Every structure is written in structure tokens, then in C-alpha cells.
Amino acid sequence: IRDSSSSRGLGDVYKRQVLVPLYKQGAADEESILRALYVASGIGAVIAYRACIAGAAGGCQAEIGSASAMAAGALTAIRGGSNAQIGHAVAMALKNLMGLVCDPVAGLVEVPCVKRNVVGAVNAISCADMALAGVESRIPVDQVIDCMGEVGRRMPVEFRETALGGLAVTPAGLAVKERMQRGEF
């Protein structure tokens, strides 16, 4: 399995940080990884249909949250979880990142995005572990997805990948932007 993803968002969490390491460490074979990718794709399609998966549309909760949910579901599946457990893992992963804004410094998908990917991956692993241990989401997965969509629609535009709010407009964030504009990075 080649890791050709260049994404710092959606693909990075579920593919680079969760599934590829499983394969490289010998914890899953290629067929299992491919099945997990189908599970992740199905989860992503449902989220995209019912809500959104882009930071510009719904904040980082939509991008990293969706990726984390896809990874949680895929990991639960690869480890033998039931469909119900997959749903619980997805719901918990989304709930944990609900409301997360998208505020890229200098408008680039770098800061804080790269570090949020790690949080998304850890969240996915934790939620898969909880679901496999029998922890259930009190709110059904479809309702969690719908809620995330509503939160994203109500989120001010400044917090939806515009670099007009959040960390992007802190003094340090603006200083990075100015240095980039001068060609110092």
C-alpha cells in the first residue's frame, strides 16, 4: 500500500495516521486495509450527504472531525467490530470534535492543521477502543452527523477556513502571515 496522500486534512487522519501504520507494522494485511477504506469511504459519503466534510463549509469539525470519524469506523471494522460498534465509534469521534473551528494561519493548511490531524487520529483510536469495549453513544450516529452539519452552518464565516478569525488573527498568526508575504518562509 502506497501512501500518496498529500492532504493535511481529511485524508491525512484516516489514511496516513491510522491505516497505513497498521499495514506497515503488520497489524493488518492489504485486504483488511482495503475493506477498511471502503468502510471509511461509506462513512465519509454519509457525512458529506447529511452534513459536510470541508473546513470551508463547516469548520475543522467537518474536516478533521469527519476524518476522525472515518478512521474510528474503519479501525473498529478492521478490529472485528459490529456495525453497531462502528456507528458508536463514528458518533463518539464526531461528538468529541464538534464545534472545532477552521482557522489556518496565513490561510495555509499548516498551522494549526497538522497538529489537529494528530488529535483527530488519537481521537479515532480512542473512540474505536471505547466502542469495541462496549461504550455506546447516547445520541445515534445519524443525529450526531445532522447536528454537526447544523453547527457548521451556524458557524460564523470567520471560523470556516477564511483565515479571518481564531488563531489566524492572533498577533503571532498575523506576524507569520506578514513574514510569508515578505518571502521570509
Role assignments for model-derived ranges:
Residues 2, 47-57, 104-109:
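Glycine/charged-rich beta-loop-alpha catalytic/anionic-binding loops adjacent to active sites
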Residues 16-28, 72-80:
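Alpha-helical support elements that line or immediately flank enzyme active sites
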Residues 22-43, 88-92, 168, 172:
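An acidic intrinsically disordered interaction segment
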Residues 31, 55-63, 111-115, 139:
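Alpha-helix capping and helix-loop boundary segments enriched in small/acidic/polar residues
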Residues 43, 49, 62-68:
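Glycine- and acidic-residue-rich phosphate-binding/metal-coordinating active-site segment common to enzymes
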Residues 68, 73-185:
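Functionally critical mobile loop/hinge segments
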